[in-house]
Amino acid sequence: MKVIFAGTPDFAAAALKAVAAAGFEIPLVLTQPDRPKGRGMQLTAPPVKQAALELGLRVAQPEKLRNNAEALQMLKEVEADVMVVAAYGLILPQEVLDTPKHGCLNIHASLLPRWRGAAPIQRAIEAGDAETGVCIMQMDIGLDTGDVVSEHRYAIQPTDTANEVHDALMEIGAAAVVADLQQLQSKGRLNAVKQPEEGVTYAQKLSKEEARIDWSESADIIERKIRAFNPVPAAWVEYQGKPMKIRRAEVVAQQGTAGEVLSCSADGLVVACGESALKITELQPAGGRRMNIAAFAAGRSIEAGAKL
């Protein structure tokens, strides 16, 4: 069975490797163009391209698929049975969705229809959801509105960051899409069910500004945001005129004026919130490395009563 693969980041690269390891023929891999990255802004290949080249697969990196006759012709010439799409980052027009014999399967990191859109992992944590998961979806022209082929649940742990949930769902998604491809190969079809009309929510793209901590919010809300925005865009506060990223914190039963430092020791930096307080245990000063609070407190003095 011929499988075109389309994806860009690590989440997708894991799925590509799993599909290849399962023995499916992959005549073409689509990924986004190389982009400048890092402090040196060096042109860097996306993880899917790196994985594809290691596997000896053909790679194409079109800037867009919409109104791109050359890319469409390339896809048609492959005569693929199905396309697997995972965090590709480009819009697939209807003519692309229709090109493979069995259409396009998307690996989506939420329990649809909850958290359609760009940042489902982060929004699930931010909202305090007890669970999330992966859906393999038959793509249509809408935003994550296609019929669901399979659903795989994951319990969000109280200390899970977006990075940790991402890594768990990455493995779940890779295994899930392989299982569905194997079913398609053996039965010639997939049983997909329509998404419920109720329970639809949208996971809007993250912004740096929304990650700025508002101490007037409750400690529970802020703690969830810290985990949801870890590693990027990273929850932050202004400290000595510069942004300081907050990486880990826990809720403590203390009270004070919102934004007031209640204590600072090797055990944690305690800051009052609109309700209860947060004990910050790991942070990252502007231009510096991540550090635990003991290392931070050893070189700096933040007095009780100071404002963050």
Curated annotation (Swiss-Prot):
The keyword Iron does not apply. GO terms for cellular component: cytosol. The keyword Transferase applies. (6S)-5,6,7,8-tetrahydrofolate binds at residues 110-113. It catalyses: L-methionyl-tRNA(fMet) + (6R)-10-formyltetrahydrofolate = N-formyl-L-methionyl-tRNA(fMet) + (6S)-5,6,7,8-tetrahydrofolate + H(+). It is an enzyme of class 2 (transferase). Belongs to the Fmt family. This is Methionyl-tRNA formyltransferase. It comes from Neisseria gonorrhoeae (strain ATCC 700825 / FA 1090).
